[in-house]
């Protein structure tokens, strides 16, 4: 019964992710049994129609080893029930897979992107590198000047090769499948509220297969602890501290950047 209820609540989750959720709730259930019931009750996720993707050799960047080493940005488009279209700026930490921001508005310029990044940085600290496509917002004078003044490296993927920004491609697919295709947005404030709730759920509750089924938040906390222990061991052998303990980059609070 709980499996069916959870599958109804998480309609786009497969049996593996549902099994993780059940175990987290304290249900001692075998994964094969979950799979069998999942099939018998016809809870299987229905495949959506595919879309054309740019062809070409995948050239993924090296996997970052710490939070804030690399963020990636992208846009997703949707529309409200009255037909008005809006865009969503997605900001992802490529190491922890945390969604740092979902910014929804009818217009998102390069200057607006810069303001939203500044707001995230105030909460989380500055990234070493940001990855994006070559959209006009990301190649605007506002973004170029910001990257130069902050010292953040900005890496542009090859034109027509969205797969080179694989972290955002994967995240945007989950966002589309689990939320946007399932929700009717009545207004922009409604869309922002729903996106915020989903972002928090994604970071704090949703198990991630690439993180050993940990949530992005739990993985970030575990990784931060490992980095802290390593730094303590190094610091014990050093003449002086190697890093400022008040460095704001150690703050891993998540933030949703919203339009006022």
Outline where the language-model segments fall.
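Mobile genetic element proteins and their domesticated derivatives, centered on retroelements
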Residues: 3, 18, 34, 38, ...
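C-terminal domain-tail junction helix/linker
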Residues: 63, 148-150, 173-260
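Acidic/histidine-rich, metal-coordinating catalytic segments
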Residues: 117, 124-140, 159-162, 214-217
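Mobile-element integrase/transposase regions
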Residues: 28, 32-92, 98, 110-116, ...
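Basic, flexible linker segments flanking DNA-binding modules
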Residues: 1-70, 136, 159-162, 215-225
């Amino acid at each position: 019964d709980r499996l069916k209820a959870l599958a109804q609540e998480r309609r786009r989750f497969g049996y593996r992710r549902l099994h993780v959720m059940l175990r987290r709730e304290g249900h001692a259930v075998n994964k094969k049994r979950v799979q069998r019931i999942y099939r018998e009750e016809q809870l299987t996720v229905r495949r959506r129609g595919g879309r054309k993707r740019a062809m070409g050799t995948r050239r993924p960047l090296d996997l970052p080893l710490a939070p804030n080493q690399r963020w990636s940005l992208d846009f997703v488009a949707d529309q409200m029930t009255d037909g008005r279209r809006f865009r969503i700026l997605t900001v992802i930490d490529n190491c922890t897979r945390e969604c740092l921001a979902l910014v929804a508005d009818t217009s998102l310029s390069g200057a607006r992107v810069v303001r939203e990044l500044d707001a995230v940085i105030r909460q989380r600290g500055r990234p070493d590198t940001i990855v994006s496509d070559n959209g006009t917002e990301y190649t605007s004078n506002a973004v170029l000047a910001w990257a130069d003044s902050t010292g953040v490296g900005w890496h542009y993927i090859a034109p027509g090769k969205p797969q080179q920004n694989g972290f955002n491609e994967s995240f945007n697919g989950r966002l589309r499948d689990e939320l946007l295709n399932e929700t009717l947005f009545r207004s922009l404030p409604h869309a922002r509220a729903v996106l915020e709730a989903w972002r928090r759920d994604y970071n704090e509750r949703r198990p991630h297969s690439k993180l050993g089924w940990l949530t992005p938040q739990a993985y970030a906390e575990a990784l931060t602890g490992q980095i802290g222990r390593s730094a303590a061991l190094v610091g014990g052998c050093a003449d002086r501290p190697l890093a400022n303990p008040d460095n704001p980059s150690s703050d891993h609070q998540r933030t949703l950047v919203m339009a006022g």
